[in-house]
Amino acid sequence: MDGVKSAGEWDDAAMTQFAVAPGWNVRVFAKHDAQYIYFDFEGVTHAGGRLFPEILVDPRKTQSTAWQKGQWWLHVSNNLCEGNGAPNVYESKGKSLCTHRKPGWDANNPPDAGTEIIEVKISFAKLGVGYSPDMKIGLAFDVTDATGKAGQKTYNWPASAKIDSPKTWGVAVLD
């Protein structure tokens, strides 16, 4: 997870993109092996702005209307933050739960000022599932300016995804 896209590194990946603003699109590449799912977020910087990726995973594709244990929120900014069964889990009892490293997943963080690519790898073991061909998972992405203020901006894929409702997320088929 170095934040550098080597020649051919992502040629075998699926890709989606979503608009942030006119002329600003974020592209997300995804691929996997038997142990990990890998993501590459490109276009996280534009005209002096920076966005930070979040990955929402429903590994058993339960498509519940509200969060349940086993559904993951993974956030990459100056630290890695995660929630199992809840989004936006930054602290508990006044103590930060975010760190530079987390068991079962990794990313190139904190991103340097010039970092334009965020790479993430998540183990299937972290998600509590084993890989099997043609498995389907619930999946959504968002990028946020991570200000922590009321006006914090967030952009989603799929566009209709709601962070609080796994039922609204997309479905990924891992072949």
Task: Label each region the model flagged.
Residues 1-175:
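Structural preference for beta-rich elements and adjacent junctions enriched in aromatics
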